[in-house]
Amino acid sequence: MLECQSMMEKLSPFVDVASLEIESLRRIKRPKRFSEEESEETENTTNSSNAVFGFPNLPEEPNRDMDQSVLCRICVRLPDGRRIQRSFLKSESVQLLWSFCYSQIGDESSERKRRFKLIQGFPGDYKNLYFGSNTTFEQSGLANSLVSVTWL
């Protein structure tokens, strides 16, 4: 019996530390579930904001009277079947294309929350476009092309 008692005395400092750690963990706020975060997010955001997905602000469309060597025209096919066009400067970031597509997606809140991807199609193949690429329209080869928006 003495062995058990001495063993308990040796382990007691560790048990005390463990109980303190458990108490401190109980005091920490529990992370919110996804559905709770989603409901708060929908209350705090508006449908016209690009900030929901972190897209950059879309500047005004360049004037068509500008030199055609610095402009490119992009045609976008949306998931609802509409086709829209917009001019960009060839030196602008491709990330603006995501802002433009997001601004044209339907006004229903369910569509505004959905994630989408952009695909550039050409005969016999297609290319997925990635938001993280910091290239210009000229560097990416998107100048004067057709891009499709599809839901993820």
Curated annotation (Swiss-Prot):
One Pfam family of this chain: UBX
Keywords on record: Ubl conjugation pathway
CDD domains associated with the record: UBX (cd01767)
Disordered: region residues: 32-61
Stored InterPro entries: Ubiquitin-like_domsf (IPR029071), UBX_dom (IPR001012), UBX_domain-protein (IPR050730)
Keyword field contains Transit peptide: no
Domain UBX, residue spans: 67-150
Entry superkingdom: Eukaryota
Record-given protein name: Plant UBX domain-containing protein 12
Organism: Arabidopsis thaliana (Mouse-ear cress)
Gene: PUX12
